[in-house]
Amino acid sequence: MPAKGRYFLNEGDEGPDQAALYEKYRLTSLHGPLLLLLLLVAAATCIALISIAFSHEDLRRHQVVLGTAFLMLTLFVALYVLVYVECLVQRWLRALALLTWACLMVLGSVLMWDSLENEAHAWEQVPFFLFVVFVVYALLPLSRRAAIVAGVTSTVSHLLVFGAVTRAFQTSMSSTQLGLQLLANAVILLGGNFTGAFHKHQLQDASRDLFIYTVKCIQIRRKLRVEKRQQENLLLSVLPAHISMGMKLAIIERLKEGGDRHYMPDNNFHSLYVKRHQNVSILYADIVGFTRLASDCSPKELVVVLNELFGKFDQIAKANECMRIKILGDCYYCVSGLPVSLPTHARNCVKMGLDICEAIKQVREATGVDISMRVGIHSGNVLCGVIGLRKWQYDVWSHDVSLANRMEAAGVPGRVHITEATLNHLDKAYEVEDGHGEQRDPYLKEMNIRTYLVIDPRSQQPPPPSHHLSKPKGDATLKMRASVRVTRYLESWGAARPFAHLNHRESVSSSETPISNGRRQKAIPLRRHRAPDRSASPKGRLEDDCDDEMLSAIEGLSSTRPCCSKSDDFHTFGPIFLEKGFEREYRLVPIPRARYDFACASLVFVCILLVHLLVMPRMATLGVSFGLVACLLGLVLSFCFATEFSRCFPSRSTLQAISESVETQPLVRLVLVVLTVGSLLTVAIINMPLTLNPGPEQPGDNKTSPLAAQNRVGTPCELLPYYTCSCILGFIACSVFLRMSLELKAMLLTVALVAYLLLFNLSPCWHVSGNSTETNGTQRTRLLLSDAQSMPSHTLAPGARETAPSPSYLERDLKIMVNFYLILFYATLILLSRQIDYYCRLDCLWKKKFKKEHEEFETMENVNRLLLENVLPAHVAAHFIGDKAAEDWYHQSYDCVCVMFASVPDFKVFYTECDVNKEGLECLRLLNEIIADFDELLLKPKFSGVEKIKTIGSTYMAAAGLSAPSGHENQDLERKHVHIGVLVEFSMALMSKLDGINRHSFNSFRLRVGINHGPVIAGVIGARKPQYDIWGNTVNVASRMESTGELGKIQVTEETCTILQGLGYSCECRGLINVKGKGELRTYFVCTDTAKFQGLGLN
């Protein structure tokens, strides 16, 4: 798994672009809460206007508040329209938020001064300013610091103004009572500040987590698209499209089954990806004189020459609708008519043969190096596909393929040699002459194949004057080595590097990107106006694309309409996931730092307790109820913070498990939340019936102790605002649990609201005189007088007994106020909880998508790794991975590499094409089993140093010693040459595998093996179909050791025999044999019966 810093932006290492994206995201995410606040305030103002209009007969007394409220309503509606216009949000959102706060403060000030027309009370507008304080943190798009400043300013302004005003206008309350009342106001507002700040902190952390996972998900999604495109390009660079998809699915299935090293087929046979095609033409081409040229080349020059030559051939093949099949040393063969049949397949191949002959002719004339092209073509049927499990190479098999190979061997340098079957498909498009191929190849004579040489139409035209085709005549040029002259000339052709196409910009798809809110975004335009240094880097281009996609995702995450927008992930009318099982998974997600939510709720309890202690009568029921809740919350907190006590107790693991269960166990967390929130909502109101019920005693009875009476703020009705504020604090405590289920939160708040409204509206304080027919004003006067008479004289202000209160506006306004603010806070918290629940679900959704896409990305990485390692050795594949891939040719020289060729000669006799074996397909199925079993041996740790190079028909080529470059001269002889012994052991394991296949298939195949060691050159050639290969005299001699060997034996050269004998192997001298191109060589057979017991150097 790649490191986090490699693929993702770290939270603490954000660049300017990332910081700007986060700022844009933060403002966008706060867009919806501001709209919600403006909508709530506008609705509340409208309701307040209506209630004042219908509850007061004389509206002239409230002209100021009515005018101000109407003006504020107009402003809030205007602000809503401005905020809704999203183009204004980014620049003016903070200004609009501050303007909204200022309007709320103005409205609160007007309401305060309006109350001075009656009797002033310290509890006036406390719920309103508590609402302002809470929404400053929860709904206004302000920074944490700005929100704290605004909240504290709102608190201090209310306390200072009402403290001064109440002291000046209040005549019925002592200084002690006024001080206690103002102190209770401070506790309420400070509790709102702290709870709001905690709520904002939690919400910002959750919002940042959502942003981080959104960025990660988009980055991984972009990388996934790149990986998929690279995977397709890589697979198509090795295999044709009609075969690659099936093999790709097989690789993914293999990874799911537990990795490539533990893969076992589902049946007795390995998958066979071979198809039969008819009416195709096969072209074989060999560079005559290349062996002599290659011996003079340095490793880099050899790789450059092969890449430039075969790159040019690939271009010619593409222009002539031919598909290159494979490169075998300096041999190049291709087919026309694959995978789609072409009526012009013969003409295509002939045209290509003439073009490559002309290309080599230009090289010869420009450099003076004696090389030419020999081309053979035959038309017929082929079986094409891939066999084996490792180092896939697209190949073709059939008798017609073998005949085409023979046509090349029997051809004439510089000419195109074709069979009569190909001539019949040319439709006289080219003139030909008799080829006499049967005179140069006995197989053609035996099969009575008539051959022809194609006459190049260009040879009949006068040669154009072209100075660059003339043979070099300068002395300096002639003194250059032939390889240097050829290399310099071929470099001017500018062939593409292997795998260069994998990092092209066009490989990144910019198709439509699904966003989680259900809206499908348009294709993201690729930025081309960036600075060259940024756009030149694949990493920079990837970051640009991620920024573009992130901007689209931010628009999709806009919370303007989360409740009503159509989504592919959520139900239309409820925050429930559509995906089956994901709803339960979401509810089981652990909640980190959940214990701090309980700590904040406990602080709200402390605020409610202080308010009751300051302004409520001190009765036994108050102590009992708050004592029980305090014990309960203490138990909950000890449960949540059990790890903090682990140092003091030996059972540390038990305490840690208890504490962690709060975050990881939903049922435990649910029980604790219900107990905590339920106890707070209950304790806020449970004492009200006892406090406000005057009981059977008469008004003149004084059964209240002086201490209790001293702590009363006034009449029972005047206690209602503080019970209301306590209930509101209980509501707010419910909001600190951000991840609480919306249904549970709504249920608790709804039950509490109904109970509160019933208790407040049915309170006895509204019906003190029972069925009395007195006016409300008289009831109010009697209530106030009776209550005043029941208090000790030292607690009343001078003249209080003689002062009669004003008419009974208080009762009516208190009732409206209680109902209004309870419903306002309820609606605010329900809508806010709905929005928070949406974002919590969105956060969980992005995390799930990130996890899923990250797993898919890792799968793609593994698939790409397997694909690349199926083309190249692992250490070579690393050269082509990353941003610097394909910047240079890959080549490497080795001093001591052991090369093995192992063939099954009897397979050529076994292979037949008839209806019984599906025209040879079943024969290839057996060959596929043989090669696949050979490949499975490579997975054993013992043979980890053996590298399969390729298969040539029924010949298996492998090498050992390629995993590390040259430079092991200081090692002892046994360890330096241990890989030679490993390859011999591998050869014997191949023989053993073949014997097992013979037993199951009732055949008698025998392996013929040739081994040689020495210096080689390794490299990757071919841009369209990159191929790893090795070259050198060592490879040629190893091939001759196989072709001149005997069945069931391993033939080695004299030098290799000496090394093997030093490693403890026994060898038998065969004697001198004639080897093509090498003359007579003394060779040896490795004794396979005793070698496995005498391999001393393999441990």
Curated annotation (Swiss-Prot):
GO terms for molecular function: adenylate cyclase activity; ATP binding; metal ion binding. It comes from the Eukaryota. Mg(2+) 1 binds at D286, D330. Its cofactor is Mg(2+); Mn(2+). It is found in: Membrane. This is Adenylate cyclase type 7. InterPro entries: A/G_cyclase, A/G_cyclase_CS, AC_N, Adcy, Adcy_conserved_dom, Nucleotide_cyclase. Binds 2 magnesium ions per subunit. Is also active with manganese (in vitro). The gene is Adcy7. SMART domains: CYCc. Mg(2+) 2 binds at D286, I287, D330. It comes from Mus musculus (Mouse). Phosphorylated by PRKCD. Residues 508-585 are annotated as: Modulates adenylate cyclase activity by modulating the binding of G(s)alpha to the high-affinity G(s)alpha binding site in 7C1a/7C2. Residues 493-501 are annotated as: Mediates regulation of adenylate cyclase activity by sphingosine 1-phosphate-induced G alpha 13 pathway. Residues 479-484 are annotated as: Mediates regulation of adenylate cyclase activity by C5 alpha-induced G- beta and gamma pathway. Keywords: ATP-binding, cAMP biosynthesis, Glycoprotein, Lyase, Magnesium, Manganese, Membrane, Metal-binding, Nucleotide-binding, Repeat, Transmembrane, Transmembrane helix. Most abundant in heart, spleen and lung.
